[in-house]
């Protein structure tokens, strides 16, 4: 046990986490040079391209240290983005230590801080590492000071390295072995293993990545998953080096995979505890699950519709397959008059939503229309019942509503001092309430309470553009609060288009209605009759634009002549247009649905 070390790497996007992981794997000989490729642990194309890690991965390596002992080190790769913070907390609770990687040229950023605090709360030993010291603009002293000011851990003996060139990587491993404690746990106790991650493999079913805390696990054991009580027979256990290698058993302190013929990913939830099923000789089930398991709840909802309605079944299959690998994705069928059949999907956050969309388009070749993302409102109706509304079309009539509650999140923003004014203006414009403001060295930390609905649309993009990309943020759900929000409907020729409805704050509703209507006017093609585009709140019309009819010049053949002859022809044309308007319907082009997403304040 004393020779095992379990650790993960915490870093902000682009601070070199995956590259450092590559170097450590190479240094310990986990893969031959031929199999080595950049970002070994990021297995999805999107992960590579965006340079982010979404799913947790592991590598079990052996390292011969300078004191002559051979250590087994388990590297558990964690996602870095706030949307996946639950996955991070599970990965961290499987470790005794974490390398805090900070880019020496950029200093500390928000998501690093969020994940680092999570590590400290879980009692994980944090080892600071300064990366990218080969860059000319690297300033290790400033970065050390920032780690001390912002996070509050001692960084005087932080290791410096450059993951790109491989400089100092051995020092990082040595420092980690010296400072991270070996795992505690007892191989003789009843089995308790924490599921760090699970994914679906086409050949063997669900593969669970586990950290064995107590006890041991062999093939042919019967196991029970404690959150839902299902039992399974273990077929294989083993470790990743990042290639999978079967082992005869996994015992306390080790990290490895378990394959037990589970068909549904929903059964093997991240954070759940695996133990032995009762009634096996010499195997006692654990009485208590490991702490910290919670169901992940989606925060953002959007409708996904296939462009061709014939692709509906294909979209359903694609979503089913995606859900095999992403248990936090929820979806249910819904029908829209404008867009036909599709699905209402729930996501952890905006990045998650983008990634799901991208994976559907890339891996499954779908063409999708996405409606504006919404958050879940709690509506207290006049009969006292409470309704959760994740779709504007489900919002009851105004007369039946007592109060509407909206989700509020606490947002931590970090930025260089020169951008504070602009960011504060942005937050105030988004109905934010300032809770706190700290100066930490050259950085400023702002804490705001903001309505989730304001963040969902374009807060992140705006924050990045006004701070030239230097500001970073993380957010967590706080509570539901009463809010004065209304539903804005868009009517085209007096008919409501459900997919274009949005729920906005009353103070912003008229402006929003006008903007959308003006934008739609430019997008809807001219018809043979006038098209009226209106925005309505309840039965009040707040904005209107007309798309003028295309018409033939009926007077072309009249040269000179009597005015009454011309009038007769014009009246006749008018009658025809009127008749057309009664029977004609307007095709709404695809861009119209996207336009809703891009309305500026």
Swiss-Prot record:
EC numbers, comma separated: 3.6.5.n1
Family: Belongs to the TRAFAC class translation factor GTPase superfamily. Classic translation factor GTPase family. LepA subfamily.
Major place of residence: membrane
Organism in which the protein naturally occurs: Polynucleobacter asymbioticus (strain DSM 18221 / CIP 109841 / QLW-P1DMWA-1) (Polynucleobacter necessarius subsp. asymbioticus)
Catalytic activity: GTP + H2O = GDP + phosphate + H(+)
UniProt domain tr-type G: residue ranges: 2-184
Binding sites annotated in the UniProt record for GTP: 14-19, 131-134
UniProt xrefs under SUPFAM superfamilies: EF-G C-terminal domain-like, P-loop containing nucleoside triphosphate hydrolases, Translation proteins
Function of the protein: Required for accurate and efficient protein synthesis under certain stress conditions. May act as a fidelity factor of the translation reaction, by catalyzing a one-codon backward translocation of tRNAs on improperly translocated ribosomes. Back-translocation proceeds from a post-translocation (POST) complex to a pre-translocation (PRE) complex, thus giving elongation factor G a second chance to translocate the tRNAs correctly. Binds to ribosomes in a GTP-dependent manner.
Keywords: Cell inner membrane, Cell membrane, GTP-binding, Hydrolase, Membrane, Nucleotide-binding, Protein biosynthesis
Any one Gene Ontology cellular component term annotated for this protein: plasma membrane
Name of the gene encoding the protein in the UniProt record: lepA
Places the protein is found: Cell inner membrane
Domain of life the protein comes from: Bacteria
Name assigned to this protein: Elongation factor 4
CDD domains documented for this protein: EF4_III, LepA, lepA_C
């Amino acid at each position: 046990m004393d020779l095992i070390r379990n650790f993960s790497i915490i870093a902000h996007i682009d601070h070199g986490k995956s590259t450092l992981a590559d170097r450590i794997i190479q240094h310990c000989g986990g893969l031959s040079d031929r199999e080595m490729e950049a970002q070994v642990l990021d297995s999805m194309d999107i992960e590579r391209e965006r340079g982010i890690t979404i799913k947790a991965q592991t590598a079990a390596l052996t390292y011969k240290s300078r004191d002559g002992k051979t250590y087994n080190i388990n590297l558990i790769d964690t996602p870095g983005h706030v949307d996946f913070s639950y996955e991070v907390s599970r990965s961290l609770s499987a470790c005794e230590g974490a390398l805090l990687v900070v880019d020496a040229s950029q200093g500390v950023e928000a998501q690093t801080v969020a994940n680092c605090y999570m590590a400290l709360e879980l009692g994980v030993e944090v080892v600071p590492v300064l990366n990218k010291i080969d860059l000319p603009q690297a300033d290790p002293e400033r970065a050390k000071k920032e780690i001390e000011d912002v996070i509050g851990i001692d960084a005087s003996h932080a290791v410096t390295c450059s993951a790109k060139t491989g400089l100092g990587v051995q020092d990082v491993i040595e420092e980690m072995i010296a400072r991270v404690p070996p795992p505690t746990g007892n191989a003789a106790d009843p089995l308790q293993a924490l599921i760090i991650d699970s994914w679906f493999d086409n050949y063997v079913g669900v593969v669970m990545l586990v950290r064995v805390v107590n006890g041991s696990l062999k093939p042919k054991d019967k196991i029970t998953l404690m959150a839902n009580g299902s039992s399974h027979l273990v077929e294989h256990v083993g470790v990743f080096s990042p290639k999978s290698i079967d082992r005869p058993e996994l015992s306390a302190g080790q990290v490895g995979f378990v394959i037990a013929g589970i068909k549904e990913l929903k059964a093997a939830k991240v954070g759940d505890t695996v133990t032995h099923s009762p009634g096996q000789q010499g195997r006692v089930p654990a009485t208590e699950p490991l702490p910290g398991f919670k169901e992940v709840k989606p925060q953002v909802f959007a409708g996904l519709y296939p462009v061709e309605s014939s692709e509906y079944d294909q979209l359903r299959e694609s979503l089913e397959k995606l859900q095999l690998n992403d248990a936090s994705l929820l979806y249910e069928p819904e029908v829209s008059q404008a867009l036909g059949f599709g699905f209402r999907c729930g996501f952890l956050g905006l990045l998650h939503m983008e990634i799901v969309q991208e994976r559907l388009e890339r891996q499954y070749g779908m063409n999708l229309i996405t409606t504006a993302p919404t958050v879940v409102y709690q509506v207290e109706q006049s009969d006292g019942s409470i309704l959760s509304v994740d779709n504007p079309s489900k919002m009851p009539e105004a007369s039946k509503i007592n109060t509407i509650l909206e989700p509020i999140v606490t947002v931590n923003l970090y930025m260089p001092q020169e951008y504070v004014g602009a960011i504060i203006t942005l937050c105030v414009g988004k109905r934010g309430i300032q809770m706190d403001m700290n100066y930490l060295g050259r950085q400023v930390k702002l804490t705001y309470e903001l309505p989730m609905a304001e963040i969902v649309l374009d807060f992140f993009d705006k924050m990045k553009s006004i701070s030239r990309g230097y500001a970073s943020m993380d957010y967590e759900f706080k509570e539901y609060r009463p809010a004065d929000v209304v539903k804005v409907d868009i009517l085209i020729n007096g008919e409501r288009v459900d997919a274009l409805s949005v729920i906005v704050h009353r103070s912003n509703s008229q402006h929003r209605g006008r903007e959308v209507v003006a934008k739609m006017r430019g997008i809807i093609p001219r018809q043979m009759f006038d098209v009226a585009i209106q925005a309505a709140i309840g039965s009040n019309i707040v904005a209107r634009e007309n798309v003028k009819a295309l018409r033939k010049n009926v007077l072309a053949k009249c040269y000179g002549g009597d005015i009454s002859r011309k009038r007769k022809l014009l009246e006749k044309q008018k009658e025809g247009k009127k008749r057309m308007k009664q029977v004609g319907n307007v095709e709404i082009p695809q861009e119209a649905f996207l336009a809703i997403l891009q309305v500026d304040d």
